Amino acid sequence: MDVMSNASVPLDVASAVDHLMNFLTVEGVTGQEADIAAAVSDALKKVGVPAAAIRFDDANTRIPVPTQTGNLIVDLPGTRLGPPLLFSTHLDTVPLCAGAKPRREGDRIVSDGTTALGGDARTGVALLVVLERRTERRIREVPGWGDL
């Protein structure tokens, strides 16, 4: 396992790359994010996030263009007192990313040349899933976790 770390958060790079490669292949151009939203929701559940902590808002019903889904929101309790933290990324990609076929070239992930990659959006999503996997054991120790 390739692990990058600093004093606070070790990062499982191999897992992040696996999630990224998967997410890059899931369709999700702007307005059509239902498939990638479902894939991310499923990945979060697989790393231990309770389904009750995952929700979608109704932003898609309040904007003037047709969209499939609202924002994916995950509410998790903290591990210590203090102000809440927000981690944010986006799910959608530009139309040039439709049908993306990512591949590895050494330590790089690239498109096959027929589409754009969509790595900006999906890298953030993969990182958040891996960070949740890393912290889930500590979060589960917080009183009230089972009440979600």
Residue ranges and their predicted role:
Residues 2-32:
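N-terminal capping segment at the start of a domain
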Residues 12-19, 32-40, 70, 83, ...:
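General structural feature for long, well-ordered alpha-helical segments within catalytic domains
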Residues 21-25, 56, 109, 113-116:
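Short amphipathic alpha-helical segments at helix-loop
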Residues 22-29, 45-50, 133-140:
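Generic secondary-structure signature for well-ordered alpha-helical cores
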Residues 26-28, 58, 89, 148:
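Short glycine-centered, acidic/aromatic-flanked micro-motifs in structured strand/loop junctions
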Residues 29-79:
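A non-catalytic alpha/beta surface segment that caps or lines the substrate-entry region
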Residues 43, 68, 75-77, 81-148:
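Active-site metal-coordination/substrate-binding segment of hydrolases
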